[in-house]
Amino acid sequence: MATLSLVLAQLGASAWAGLADALPRVKASIVIVGTYKVSDSPRFQLRGTGFVIDEGLTVVTNAHVLSEVTGLSDAPALVVQVRGSDGQWQMRRVERHYRDDAHDLALLRIEGLAVPALVVGDSERVREGDDLAFTGFPIGGILGYSPVTHRATVSSITPAALPSPSARQLQERAVRGLRNGTFDIFQLDATAYPGNSGGPLFDPNSGEVLGVINMVLIKGTRESALSQPSGIAYAIPARFIRELLERHR
């Protein structure tokens, strides 16, 4: 029994053996997605996590991170904060954005110099039982804006059931799902928090993006997500990033 436990421990360790080497590359591409308005207090408000891909000026995040911040004349500006070579966060204006609400994804085109980009990998090769990792800002800026990394195991690849704010919308979504077809989503055995939304789910050895964290199962109230995390999170497969990117090149 002791020998079996040792073997299992070694197998688990080897799955994340390259994480320490991959992390510097991953963290260089992690950004903060939020809003900025002079009359707001605080002026900058974090909405979620994002990460840079492609040519270094395209950010991936969740569509729900943008909800309620776009389309209104008096809405705060949608901005992204990137970490400069001096380690300080720099605010970048979002020049335009594209949404895929069906898959809860969004692409943001930002101004300025290119940021180190992550490679979008092949999410079709992800299997149940795979050990992955994700990085983001789980509890916002409470402890400062420092990206945090968690390990995750793919516990299930299951049909998506994205949350809706009302029963009526749930019914409409179900109808659209039947019309447009359903898609699979990664269920993760991992502790994530609302601030992780939009962060990359990646291969811990190569750093390639295999999914986007999009929701956390919350037991009870939203506040209980911090005090009593469910240990269950979900991620959108990366193939939908590729499809959205191709539509808006």
Feature locations, PLM:
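Catalytic-histidine neighborhood of serine endopeptidases
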Residues: 54-100
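Bacterial N-terminal signal peptides
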Residues: 2-10
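Short, well-ordered loop/turn sites that connect or cap secondary structure elements
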Residues: 53-54, 126-127, 204
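Beta-strand/loop subdomains of soluble extracytoplasmic proteins
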Residues: 76-79, 85-94, 128-133, 147-171
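Active-site region of chymotrypsin-like
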Residues: 26-43, 109-119, 148-246
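N-terminal signal peptide c-region/cleavage motif recognized by signal peptidases
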Residues: 12-14
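A conserved glycine-rich beta-strand in the N-terminal activation segment of trypsin-fold
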Residues: 17-19, 36-58, 62, 90-93, ...
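Active-site substrate-binding loop(s) of clan PA
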Residues: 21-22, 69, 95-97, 111-146
